Amino acid sequence: MIIPLIKGLSLTLKRFLNPWTCETEAYPEKKPHLAQRFRGLPELQIEEDGKEKCVACGLCAKACPSNCITVEGAEDEETNRRYPEVYELNAFRCIFCGFCEEACPVSAVILKDTFELSTYKETGIFDKEKLLDLTRKRKGLKGPS
């Protein structure tokens, strides 16, 4: 009974006396290092010409186990290309599993490193423009083209 107590105290003293073994990070001032496989908020990707990659097939919504994605497609009459007229992501319901990313045939949905999602209820539902703005901001692009 006394030996585990001594082991615990020795570990505590060793950590206390050696300043190089500090595990605490100054989070708000210094962003944490995220693993390469980290899954954060899904973002809609943009093609080189500035148009969205999504073809509104709805596979991401079907693959989502938490039903947090809503897609309604429409067709562009000039190019005969489908696009999402409505694309909504409910960040409160999302479990960041990555199934939407795996299901997308054109790689339009990618889980990025956005993890600071504390927000009010009104702003937790991301529509198409909010998701595209996240990608534009990351790539340094201006508003819609």
Segments the model singles out, each with a brief description of its role:
Residues M1-R82, E88, F92-R93, E102, ...:
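Non-ligating segments of multi-cofactor redox enzymes
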